[in-house]
């Protein structure tokens, strides 16, 4: 019976995609799909299952009202979705903070760089073509795919039709975010004409070689090879163009550096600045006046963020992140992540980003 339902659901999505004449709506224009305020708290979805959960039923009515798909099809979808306790257990694990010297070893070491060189050589023509068109160096695209999924070898095997409902209704701390991503996912399956149960990804709902969330997929994924599908799972041209499109949309500047080493005395004022939220809130000229000396040429008018990397226990190197640093940071909100992308990119491309 489940296979029958899944097959019927796939037909519904395919027909909806074929009949649609409207362009994809940018993610920021999608209505908020957070659940209505309930007079009494609903029983946990872990106890009720999706179909019997009051919050899920409100979501179904809401999505049907928005025209995502019919209420009957949504009921079928949730009847087949499986609540995954292991996903909630993963999300509830305490977070760990690693210093740069450990993060670098695990994410941007020699093995990862060598893998990036092989990946680049294998797909050099299309990677260079995408780089020329979008202005994002090929080695940066390679580095992101390398960190995210080890060049496509570990894209995740969770069905998004299980993981996203589980997080949307079983993880209250970020329930609103994941309900929005579930909304985007249902629209994505409809627009792509695919059975929603055919999509796989990480436990948190990230998909493909670049690990796009559904909202990012809908807005920035690109069908670069022209086959009618935005295939971020198996088409390197689509993957490269999608990542480049994301970075360009978030402000990547052709020919710009990512970060520059600096010389400075770590005064309380500068350490407080390092601890501030990542943002381009100072100019290089202002940082010079505060005692920060760039060790490479950079214009005073450029915006920058001051940060440090722990190279050994208690030992630090200091840097300023520039515009392109911030563009990559918006892909993953971690200064260590951006630094690892740069490390791999420099190792693959032989440059000094």
Describe the residue ranges of each PLM region.
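Bacterial N-terminal signal peptides that target proteins for export
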Residues: 1-7
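C-terminal motif of bacterial Sec signal peptides marking the signal peptidase cleavage site
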Residues: 14-17
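Bacterial signal peptide processing site
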Residues: 19-22
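N-terminal export signals and maturation junctions of secreted/periplasmic proteins
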Residues: 37-61, 68-121
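Solvent-exposed loop/turn segments at secondary-structure junctions
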Residues: 82, 148-152, 206, 253, ...
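Acidic/His-rich structured neighborhood in mature extracellular/periplasmic domains
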Residues: 98-242, 248
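Flexible, glycine-rich surface segments
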Residues: 196, 200-304, 312
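C-terminal functional modules
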Residues: 304-353
